[in-house]
Amino acid sequence: TSVMFDGSSFSFKENIRRTKKIVALAHKYHVSVEAELGAIAGIEDFVSVADRDAHLTDPKQAIEFVRATGCDALAIAIGTKHGAYKYTGDSILDFGRLKEIAECVDVPLVLHGASGIPSSIKKICTDYGCEISNAKGVSDAAVRKAVTLGVRKVNVDTDLRLAFDAGIRKFLKERPEVIDPREILKT
């Protein structure tokens, strides 16, 4: 069992204070805590972070943050983005920053906003009415490289949402007579 706390919208000191409090409570119950340092651009849970407001994780702050909070895993910002429209060109991740952080902290690193937007899922979505033709995600090669450099957990929520959306849209097109949500969700 684990908790993910994203205090990245707070100041560095406030993020430490809040994360430390959550870690203390969670650890009483043997629950691990993933914390976030650095702001990832894009839209997540109806919260939008503009590219200009996103900032990459500072390796020196990562050291201080992990030591001060006692978090069990650290989600870092190295250039990924939340949502389906991450990039207009190829994904550009700061692998040097990732390597530096991995070398100086002793907790697993997490990559948020790492969905790849697979073309196979994108095609099903667009074939059945979803308007995501310009969606572009993190490349498989970039994710593989991040893992070789120290990332131990990769979050791909947008890919899961798109796969769900594709399946539902396809089912409803092929079986328009079905109106029971329980039947739809069984597929």
Residue ranges and their predicted role:
Residues 1-108, 116-136, 140-148, 169:
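Alpha/beta enzyme core
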